[in-house]
C-alpha cells in the first residue's frame, strides 16, 4: 500500500513516539495522573456513553476535544477506561498508518496570542478523511468530548461570553485543585467520517469546515451546561422598573391607592424582592454535595430516562421550560440535582410562597427559586411585576421550571392543570425577541413519598399544616429507606411549532410593550395544558412499589400468597412490555420475584409464613396510604382493567359489543386520567390488549368473541378490580343524574361526594380520592362536554339511564343497592 509522504512521515514519527512512550513521556503522564487521580472525581455524561450514544466499539473511535489540555485528556482517559471505551492515548492504526486517537481543536492560551496553531487539528482531520477516500470499508466514529471543571456562569460585567473557556497552566491547576470533584466529561453523539467523506468529500476545505463546526459545537455545549451570565440583582430590578409595563402599573398603583409615585415604586421593589431568585453557583455546588451524600443513603438509585433529547434541545439553543408533575416538596431538589448531573443548567423554579420561610426560603432562592403567590386576583401591580420578571428570565435565556398542577397531588394522580404561569409563558413569546421556547413535560415518581401520610389526612378533611422549620425538621427526621426515584423526560413541545399549527396568525398579536390577551389565548393555553398532562403521563414509570400496591389493593382482603402476587405482577409486566402504554413510559427489567423482594425491603407490607408458603399482606392502616402509589400508574393499566371488568361480567362478549362499551366510558376515563388515545385509536389498542390477554391465557378468542378462561380467572379478576372504584364513582353520578335530570352541576358534585363517602364507609373502600372533590368536579365537566348535562342543568334521562345500566352491570349488587337507596333516604 502507498500513501502520501506526510502520512509516511507522520507514521514514522508516531511509531517513534509510541516506542518513546516507554521513556520520559510515559513517566510524565504517570506523574501528572497521580495528583489528578486524587483530586479529580469526574462524572460521565451520559452515565454509560457507549449504549446510550450508540457507539460501536468494534469500529474505530477517535476523540475530539475543544482545546489542548493534558489534564482534560487524562480525565477523559479515566472515563474511557471505566466505560470500556478505547484509550485515547493509544494511537489508531489504519491500513498501516498510525494516527493519534485524539484531536485538540484549539491549542490553548499562549504567550503570543496571534499564534493560534489550528493547522494541526485541520491536518489530522484531513488525514482521517483521506484514509476514508482510499478505503471504502473504513468508518471512523468521531466523538466530540468536552471536559469541564466547574460550571460557574459568572456575573454580567458587559463582556461577551467566551465561546470556549481556555485556561492557562496556572488557571488549570487551580481549577483542578478547587473544582476537581465538580468535573464532568460530556460525550456527544458520534459523527461518521464515512458519511462525511461520502457526502462532502475529503479535501482540506472539508477538514477546515469540520474543525469550524466542532468549535461551534463546543461553544454551544458550554452555554447549555453553564447558562448565560447572571445579572446583578439590583441591575435586574432597575431594568424591570424601567420597563413600560411596570412603569404604567406603578402609576396606576399610585392613582388607585392615592399614594405618592415614590411609595408605589417602593411597593414594586418590595414585590421584586419577594419574587426574584438570587442564584448562586457556590450554593448549587454545596447543595450538590449534600444531596449526593443524602441520595446515596436514602435512595437505592435515581433512574433517569430520555435526558439526551433535552440536552440536544439545550445544545440547539432552545429556551427550556421544565413542566414536571408535582408529588412532593422533594421534587424541587431532585429535578435540579438530576439536571445538573445531566450536564444542564439548573433552572429558575417557580415555588409556592408558602415555602418562603426561614431558612428554606433563602436557601431555595440561591438555588434558583422565585416565589409565586397562590392567586394574582385583585393585585394588578403584583401580576405585572411577576409577568415582567418571568419575561425577563426568558429574554435572558435562563431555563425555567414550574408545576402546571399548581400544587402537590394528594391522590397520586395528576391534578387538573392551573394555566396562569403557562399563559404568561405564551405572553412572553408575544413580546417578541425570545429564543424558541420548548416545554419539557417530566414524570417524577417515587417508591416512597415522605408527605403521603399528611396527604391522606388532608383528603379526609384535616386542615393543611403550614410549612415551617419545625415541620421541615419533623419530615427530615422520618426519612429512611426511600427506595428508587424516577425522572422520565417526556416528549418536548416546541411552542412555536404548536402555535404555527394551531394558531397560524399568532404573530399578528406580538406586542413588544404591552401584555396582550388575544381571543385565541385562553382556549389555546387550555389545550396546551391538557396536552402537557397527557405527555407527562406518557412518561410514567412502573416500579416495584406501585405494581405490588396495585395487586394487593385489588384483592378483597388486601393479601395474596407470594405465588399469587408473582402471577399478578407477571400479568401487569407482560401487558406493559408487550403492549406499551407509550414509547416514553418505562417498565422494570427485573423479574416479578425480584420486584417483590425489593418491595418487601420498603417495610410497607407484612409477611405471614405457614407450612404452605408466604402470605403477603397490606395492613389496613397502610392500605389508605398505598393507594397513592397505585394511582401513580392507574392510567397505564385502566384500559386493560376496564376490558377485564367487562369480559368478567359478561363471561363472553363479541369484540364489537366490547368496543361499544369501552367507547361509552372512555371519554370519562380519558379526562380523569389524561389518557393518550383518541377514540379512533381505540380499536387497534383494544385488539392488541385482547391478543396479549389471550397470549397470557386470561381469555380465549373464539369466533371473534372474548371468553374468560376459568383456569386463569384469578389474575383476570384482579386485573378487573383495578377499574372497580372508578366505575363505582361513575355509577354514583349517573344514577343521581338519572334520578334527577334537572339537578344543577354544583349539587350533582356535592351529592355525588356524599354518596361516595357513604359507599366508602359501608363497603370498606380505602382510597381517599374516592370522594375527592376535584375528581367529581372533573367528571361533571366531562359530562357537560359529552352532552349528558347542559349548562342549564338539564340532562337527557334516556341517555344517562343507558350509561347507568351499563355501569350497574360492572359493579356488585350490594354496591348498586347502596347507590340506589341513597337517593331514597334509605340506609
UniProtKB/Swiss-Prot annotation:
UniProt pathway: Phospholipid metabolism; CDP-diacylglycerol biosynthesis; CDP-diacylglycerol from sn-glycerol 3-phosphate: step 1/3
HAMAP family the UniProt entry points to: Glyc3P_acyltrans
Species whose genome carries this gene: Shigella sonnei (strain Ss046)
Any one GO cellular component localisation term in the record: plasma membrane
UniProt motif HXXXXD motif: location: 325-330
Gene that this polypeptide is encoded by: plsB
PANTHER family with a match to the protein in the record: DIHYDROXYACETONE PHOSPHATE ACYLTRANSFERASE (PTHR12563:SF17), GLYCEROL-3-PHOSPHATE ACYLTRANSFERASE (PTHR12563)
Listed GO MF terms: glycerol-3-phosphate O-acyltransferase activity
Compartments where located: Cell inner membrane
Entry membrane topology: Peripheral membrane protein
InterPro entries in UniProt: GPAT/DHAPAT, GPAT/DHAPAT_C, GPAT/DHAPAT_LPLAT, GPAT_PlsB, Plipid/glycerol_acylTrfase
Similarity-based family: Belongs to the GPAT/DAPAT family.
Keywords, ordered alphabetically: Acyltransferase, Cell inner membrane, Cell membrane, Lipid biosynthesis, Lipid metabolism, Membrane, Phospholipid biosynthesis, Phospholipid metabolism, Transferase
Pfam families: Acyltransferase (PF01553), GPAT_C (PF19277)
Gene Ontology biological process terms in this record: CDP-diacylglycerol biosynthetic process; fatty acid metabolic process
Top-rank lineage group of the source organism: Bacteria
Record-given protein name: Glycerol-3-phosphate acyltransferase
Amino acid at each position: 500500500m502507498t500513501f502520501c509522504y506526510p502520512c509516511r512521515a507522520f507514521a514514522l514519527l508516531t511509531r517513534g513516539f509510541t516506542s518513546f512512550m516507554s521513556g520520559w513521556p510515559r513517566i510524565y503522564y504517570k506523574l501528572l495522573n497521580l495528583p489528578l487521580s486524587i483530586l479529580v472525581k469526574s462524572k460521565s455524561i451520559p452515565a454509560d456513553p457507549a449504549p446510550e450514544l450508540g457507539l460501536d466499539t468494534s469500529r474505530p473511535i477517535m476523540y475530539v476535544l475543544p482545546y489542548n489540555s493534558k489534564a482534560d485528556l487524562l480525565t477523559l482517559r479515566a472515563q474511557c477506561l471505566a466505560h470500556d471505551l478505547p484509550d485515547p492515548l493509544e494511537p489508531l492504526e489504519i491500513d498501516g498508518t498510525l494516527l493519534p486517537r485524539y484531536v485538540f481543536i484549539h491549542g490553548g492560551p499562549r504567550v503570543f496570542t496571534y499564534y493560534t496553531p489550528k493547522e494541526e487539528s485541520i491536518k489530522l482531520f484531513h488525514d482521517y478523511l483521506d484514509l476514508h477516500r482510499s478505503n471504502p470499508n473504513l468508518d471512523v466514529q468521531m466523538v466530540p468530548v468536552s471536559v469541564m471543571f466547574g460550571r460557574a456562569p459568572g456575573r454580567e460585567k458587559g463582556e461577551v461570553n467566551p465561546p470556549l473557556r481556555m485556561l492557562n497552566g496556572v488557571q488549570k491547576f487551580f481549577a483542578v485543585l478547587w473544582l476537581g470533584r465538580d468535573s464532568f466529561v460530556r460525550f456527544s453523539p458520534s459523527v461518521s467520517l464515512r458519511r462525511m467523506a461520502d457526502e462532502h468529500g475529503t479535501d482540506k476545505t472539508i477538514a477546515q469546515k469540520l474543525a469550524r463546526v466542532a468549535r461551534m459545537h463546543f461553544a454551544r455545549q458550554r452555554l447549555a451546561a453553564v447558562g448565560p451570565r447572571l445579572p446583578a440583582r439590583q441591575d435586574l430590578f432597575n431594568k424591570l422598573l424601567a420597563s413600560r409595563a411596570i412603569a404604567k402599573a406603578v402609576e396606576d398603583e399610585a392613582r388607585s391607592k392615592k399614594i405618592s409615585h415614590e411609595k408605589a415604586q417602593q411597593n414594586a421593589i418590595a414585590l421584586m424582592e419577594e419574587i426574584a431568585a438570587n442564584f448562586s453557583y457556590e450554593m448549587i455546588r454545596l447543595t450538590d454535595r449534600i444531596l449526593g451524600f443524602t441520595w446515596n443513603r436514602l435512595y437505592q438509585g435515581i433512574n433517569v430516562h430520555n435526558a439526551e433529547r433535552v440536552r440536544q434541545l439545550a445544545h440547539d439553543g432552545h429556551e427550556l421550560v421544565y413542566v414536571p408533575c408535582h408529588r412532593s416538596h422533594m421534587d424541587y431538589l431532585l429535578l435540579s440535582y438530576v439536571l445538573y448531573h445531566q450536564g444542564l443548567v439548573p433552572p429558575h423554579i417557580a415555588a409556592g410562597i408558602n415555602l418562603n420561610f426561614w431558612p428554606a426560603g433563602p436557601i431555595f432562592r440561591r438555588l434558583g427559586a422565585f416565589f409565586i403567590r397562590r392567586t394574582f386576583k385583585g393585585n394588578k401591580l403584583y401580576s405585572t411585576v411577576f409577568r415582567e420578571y418571568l419575561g425577563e428570565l426568558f429574554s435572558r435565556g435562563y431555563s425555567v421550571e414550574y408545576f402546571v398542577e399548581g400544587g402537590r397531588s394528594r391522590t397520586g394522580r395528576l391534578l387538573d392543570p392551573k394555566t396562569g404561569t403557562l399563559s404568561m409563558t405564551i405572553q412572553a413569546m408575544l413580546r417578541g425577541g425570545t429564543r424558541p421556547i420548548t416545554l419539557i413535560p417530566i414524570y417524577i415518581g417515587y417508591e416512597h413519598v415522605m408527605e403521603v401520610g399528611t396527604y391522606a389526612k388532608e383528603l379526609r378533611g384535616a386542615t393543611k399544616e403550614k410549612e415551617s422549620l419545625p415541620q421541615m425538621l419533623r419530615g427530615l427526621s422520618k426519612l429512611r429507606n426511600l427506595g428508587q426515584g424516577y425522572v422520565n423526560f417526556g416528549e418536548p413541545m416546541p411552542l412555536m411549532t404548536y402555535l404555527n399549527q394551531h394558531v397560524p396568525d399568532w404573530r399578528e398579536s406580538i406586542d413588544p410593550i404591552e401584555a396582550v390577551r388575544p381571543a385565541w389565548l385562553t382556549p389555546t393555553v387550555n389545550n396546551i395544558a391538557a396536552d402537557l398532562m397527557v405527555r407527562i403521563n406518557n412518561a410514567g414509570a412502573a416500579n416495584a412499589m406501585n405494581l405490588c400496591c396495585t395487586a394487593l389493593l385489588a384483592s378483597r382482603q388486601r393479601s395474596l400468597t407470594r405465588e399469587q402476587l408473582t402471577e399478578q405482577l407477571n400479568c401487569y409486566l407482560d401487558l406493559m412490555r408487550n403492549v406499551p402504554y407509550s414509547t416514553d413510559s418505562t417498565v422494570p427489567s427485573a423479574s416479578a420475584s425480584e420486584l417483590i423482594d425489593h418491595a418487601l425491603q420498603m417495610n410497607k407490607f407484612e409477611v405471614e409464613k405457614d407450612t404452605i408458603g408466604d402470605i403477603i399482606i397490606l395492613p389496613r392502616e397502610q392500605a389508605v396510604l398505598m393507594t397513592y402509589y397505585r394511582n401513580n400508574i392507574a392510567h397505564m393499566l385502566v384500559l386493560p382493567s376496564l376490558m377485564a371488568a367487562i369480559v368478567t361480567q359478561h363471561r363472553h362478549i363479541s369484540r364489537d359489543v366490547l368496543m361499544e362499551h369501552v367507547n361509552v366510558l372512555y371519554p370519562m376515563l380519558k379526562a380523569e386520567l389524561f389518557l393518550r388515545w383518541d377514540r379512533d385509536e381505540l380499536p387497534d389498542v383494544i385488539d392488541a390488549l385482547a391478543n396479549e390477554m389471550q397470549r397470557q391465557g386470561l381469555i380465549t378468542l373464539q369466533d371473534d368473541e372474548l371468553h374468560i378462561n376459568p383456569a386463569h380467572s384469578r389474575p383476570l379478576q384482579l386485573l378487573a378490580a383495578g377499574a372497580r372504584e372508578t366505575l363505582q364513582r361513575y355509577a354514583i353520578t349517573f344514577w343521581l343524574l338519572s334520578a334527577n335530570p334537572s339537578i344543577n352541576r354544583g349539587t350533582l358534585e356535592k351529592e355525588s361526594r356524599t354518596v361516595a363517602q357513604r359507599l366508602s364507609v359501608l363497603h370498606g373502600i380505602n382510597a381517599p380520592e374516592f370522594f375527592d372533590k376535584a375528581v367529581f368536579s372533573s367528571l361533571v365537566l366531562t359530562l357537560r362536554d359529552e352532552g349528558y348535562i347542559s349548562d342549564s342543568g338539564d340532562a337527557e334521562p334516556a341517555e344517562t339511564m343507558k350509561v347507568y345500566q351499563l355501569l350497574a352491570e360492572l359493579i356488585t349488587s350490594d354496591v348498586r343497592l347502596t347507590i340506589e337507596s341513597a337517593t331514597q333516604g334509605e340506609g
